[in-house]
Structures are given as C-alpha cells and as structure tokens.
C-alpha cells in the first residue's frame, strides 16, 4: 500500500511490504518519477528556467540537483552547504549563490511568454523519445511553434559554401522528404541548412530548426534568417536548449546544437561537406547515437564534396534519390513506433 506524508514540507511516499516479518520503507522523490503534462506547475518551470541561466548548470548538473532536492524552488533557495552536498562541487555551488540574486525567476518567465516560447522537460510526454535516448540529452528544451516532436525526422546538413549542385540537391531532397511525411531537421545556418528548410516549407511540410542560441528574435542567428525562422515557427518549430537572451554566434554553442540535431533524427543526410567540415562532426555524433548516416556523392574534383565522398568510403549509405532513404528507415514501421505510448527510460526508473 502507498501512504503519502508531508513532514517538514518534504513530501515522500512510504511503500511498505511484509517480508520476513519486517517492513521495508522506500523513500521516493515524487518529482523524479512523475511525467509533467503541458499544464506543468508554473512555479516548477520558473525556477528550472532560472537555474538554466546560471553558468555551468547543464543537463548533468540539473539532474544531480533534481535528484537531491525536493523541488526546483528548494534548489534555488538552498544554502552553500546543501548545494555542495548535492554533489555538484563547491565551485558551481558558489557560482549559483553568486549569480542567483541577479536573476528574477518571474521576470525570466515573462520574457519566455512574451516571445511565445515554452519549455519542455525530459519528463514531459511531448519530449522527443529519440532525443531522450542519447547520453547528453537536454534536461530542458525551449520550443517556439507547435508540432509533434515524435514524428519521423531526417536531418539535412551540409556546407555553408555550397555549389549550385549542392543547392539543387538539398532543396529537392528536403521537398520530397516533406512530401513523404518526414519532418526535415536542420540548423538554420547559411547554405545547405537554410535551403533544406526552404524546400520543406515550399512543400507545405514540417521542418524543425535547432538553434545554437536562444529563441528570442533579437538573438536569431544568422540575423538575415529572421523571416525564415518566423516561417518555420509558423508551420513547424524552433528548438534550443539555451535560455532566453543567450547571445548569438558563440562558437561553443554549435556542438551543443549539433547533438540535438543528431539525436532528434532517425538519420542524417549530408549534402556537400569539405574534408574538415564541422558537418562531419555532426555525422560522427549520429553514428555514436546509432543513427543512420546518408551521404550524397559529389564530384571528385570538388573541394565541397571531399568530406561526403570520404563518408561514403567509410561506410555511410550512398543516396542518389529519396527512395534510398525511405527504404532504409522503413517508414511504415517508424509511424507505428511514433504513436507508441511513452515509457520512462531505465536510467530514470
């Protein structure tokens, strides 16, 4: 049987079971086990958003804090001693103490609302299941727009310095994928990324832009893609794990963005990448996450195709038409899994 207690403002369950004439009591932090619905407690979200603005509080530290404290508000109000006891270290604990007086949780929440940005937690049923599988999954996702994040997705990435051939391929493949019911994911960078988003939009399909900055309009990067970002949010969505007012164009933020692009998708399609292109890093992430990597072959005389041709030599699947991708991912089976009920991963049980 289950009995709910509230002692000293710390709720917990006692699960009692007779075994060898003894009672075994299991103390459970309810925040760790419950799924949050779209009507999540506003207080919880406000404090989590505020914590996410503190330097050094990434997904790993956030999980440590949430496992130790009874609520996000308790974390926010904790003294140095208890923060250190949570296991996050004295340096980060001191940083939280120093930075939180300069952050107003309610004001930060109002900024989110003003920008029509909402938060998804990894315990939320809407949180993408594929992304939850990766070891570096964000604890918090910021989302602008509305769409099913568990729909089948393919990411398209490539060079900023594309050729006319690369542009033609990216647009055509994105358009055909969208027409086939696949959501096209990319990073809204110059070049292949932006062209892929445009192809999906022109097909009347769904596309997701994962950003390496926050979702407020003044920090959209590149700034020339502001109108594109509005179009994407209107029919698909923008995603980021960076809180409002995170400056645009910080180089270190792009690897964080890339792991979300790789984690969301069933597979990654690489269209034009130089020999040392950052796109290849994202392709390697996809392999680490057990995702398919597809590559479009290019001219052996083109610098922009050295990376993609090398990917193919290393085992990436050669793609010359959308049919190659659709056959590989078995779309009918994917659709069945997309509508399967959500389960709590074993790491969270």
Where are these predicted regions, by residue range?
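Glycine-biased, small-residue-rich flexible motifs in mid-sequence functional cores and linkers
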Residues: 30, 40-42, 122-349
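Short terminal hydrophobic/aromatic SLiMs and anchors at protein ends
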Residues: 9-17, 21, 36-37
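Short, positively charged patches
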Residues: 35, 39-179, 340
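Short, Lys/Arg-enriched N-terminal segments with co-localized hydrophobic residues
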Residues: 26-38
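Extreme N-terminal basic, low-complexity initiation segments
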Residues: 1-9
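Alpha-helical and His/Cys-centered functional microenvironments
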Residues: 6, 23-25, 29, 321
């Amino acid at each position: 049987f289950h009995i709910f207690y509230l002692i000293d403002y710390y709720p917990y369950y006692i699960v009692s079971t007779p075994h060898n004439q003894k009672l075994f009591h299991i103390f459970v932090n309810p925040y760790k086990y419950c799924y949050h619905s779209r009507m999540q407690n506003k207080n919880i979200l406000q404090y989590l958003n505020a914590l996410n603005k503190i330097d050094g509080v990434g997904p790993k530290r956030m999980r440590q804090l949430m496992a130790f404290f009874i609520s996000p508000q308790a974390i926010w109000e904790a003294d140095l001693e208890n923060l250190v006891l949570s296991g996050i270290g004295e340096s980060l604990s001191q940083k939280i103490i120093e930075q939180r007086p300069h952050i107003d949780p309610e004001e930060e929440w109002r900024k989110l609302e003003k920008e029509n940005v909402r938060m998804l937690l990894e315990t939320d049923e809407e949180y993408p299941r594929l992304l939850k599988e990766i070891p570096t999954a964000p604890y918090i996702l910021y989302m602008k727009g509305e769409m099913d994040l568990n729909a089948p997705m393919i990411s398209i990435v490539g060079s900023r310095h594309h050729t006319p051939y690369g542009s033609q391929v990216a647009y055509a493949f994105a358009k055909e994928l969208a027409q086939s019911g696949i959501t096209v994911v990319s990073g809204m960078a110059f070049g292949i990324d932006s062209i892929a988003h445009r192809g999906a939009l022109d097909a009347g399909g769904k596309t997701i832009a994962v950003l390496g900055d926050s979702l407020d309009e003044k920090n959209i990067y590149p700034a020339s893609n502001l109108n594109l970002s509005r179009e994407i949010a209107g029919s698909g969505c923008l995603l980021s794990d960076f809180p409002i007012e995170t400056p645009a164009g910080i180089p270190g933020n792009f690897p964080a963005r890339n792991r979300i692009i790789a984690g969301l998708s069933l597979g990654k399609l690489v269209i034009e990448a130089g020999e040392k292109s950052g796109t290849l890093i994202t392709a390697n992430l996809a392999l680490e996450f057990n995702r398919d990597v597809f590559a479009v072959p290019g001219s052996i005389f083109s610098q922009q195709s050295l990376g993609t041709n090398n990917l193919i030599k290393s085992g990436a699947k050669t793609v010359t038409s959308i049919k190659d991708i659709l056959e590989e991912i078995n779309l009918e089976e994917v659709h069945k899994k997309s509508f399967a009920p959500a389960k709590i991963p074993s790491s969270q049980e």
